[in-house]
């Protein structure tokens, strides 16, 4: 389906060999939870997509266009995951492209996986050996160049001792896990304080991360966005990872550092625990 500004593909199983997303990773994506037939945080995901469009200079699809086609892709599926991929378009091979190239906009519905953590399941996390290089121009947005994450996923697949995830570090600072942002919590005089790693020249500023920061601050909790070194982890009592598909997952251990899962944290954050 084509309108004047975008080629639109809904639940398409194939892609053109000339699509620049396939050839060069020239595009953006968002992965969104659909719960009880509601698209969760659609406006926030589109806002980040638009920011990415500004950075890599692709035309912005409007919120109304995305919402309309997202609902078609979801159909009558009550709970699922919606992936939106925005490619610069299809053209002959070569880095340069025609100025009038029409972007390709894909809407893909997939099933929700069952590997969700909760308060009772054990989640052990190790540190990734792979150290990504920074790119301040492309960090924070969901661009299609995911080779760093693929290499870290390969490392996780081959690691022993039953680890569930890997923490990515850069210059001794903790950034995030393979596909989630991190929060650390300290209890001082029965009051909780929260820290989350600064996202600078690597990593994603997640939609769920921002929602949790806003929620905690609205409830009166102090949340610091700061550099957290590996050596700082032992200072914290609790830790959890977050993303927009799985919500909050509490972590039992990172490396040798063990964490607790107090009931009060569950009560504070329960609206984000899926």
PLM region descriptions:
Residues 81-86:
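ATP-grasp fold ATP-binding core
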């Amino acid at each position: 389906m084509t309108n004047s500004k975008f080629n639109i593909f809904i639940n398409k199983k194939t892609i053109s060999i000339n699509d620049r997303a396939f050839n060069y990773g020239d595009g953006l994506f968002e992965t969104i939870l659909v719960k009880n037939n509601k698209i969760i945080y659609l406006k926030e995901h589109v806002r980040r997509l638009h920011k990415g469009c500004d950075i890599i200079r692709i035309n912005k699809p409007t919120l109304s266009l995305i919402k309309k086609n997202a609902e078609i892709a979801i159909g009558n599926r009550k709970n699922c995951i919606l992936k939106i991929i925005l490619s610069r378009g299809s053209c002959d091979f070569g880095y340069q492209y025609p100025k009038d190239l029409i972007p390709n906009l894909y809407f893909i519905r997939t099933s929700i996986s069952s590997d969700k953590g909760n308060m009772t399941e054990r989640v052990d996390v190790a540190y990734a050996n792979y150290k990504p290089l920074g790119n301040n121009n492309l960090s924070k947005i969901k661009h299609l160049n995911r080779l760093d994450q693929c290499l870290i996923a390969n490392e996780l697949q081959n690691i022993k001792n039953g680890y569930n995830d890997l923490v990515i570090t850069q210059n001794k600072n903790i950034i995030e896990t393979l596909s989630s942002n991190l929060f650390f919590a300290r209890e001082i005089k029965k009051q909780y304080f929260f820290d989350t790693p600064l996202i600078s020249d690597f990593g994603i500023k997640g939609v769920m991360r921002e929602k949790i920061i806003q929620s905690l601050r609205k409830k009166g909790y102090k949340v610091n966005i700061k550099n957290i070194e590996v050596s700082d982890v032992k200072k914290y009592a609790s830790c959890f990872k977050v993303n927009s598909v799985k919500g909050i997952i509490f972590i039992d251990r990172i490396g040798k550092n063990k964490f607790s899962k107090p009931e009060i944290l569950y009560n504070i954050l329960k609206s984000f625990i899926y």
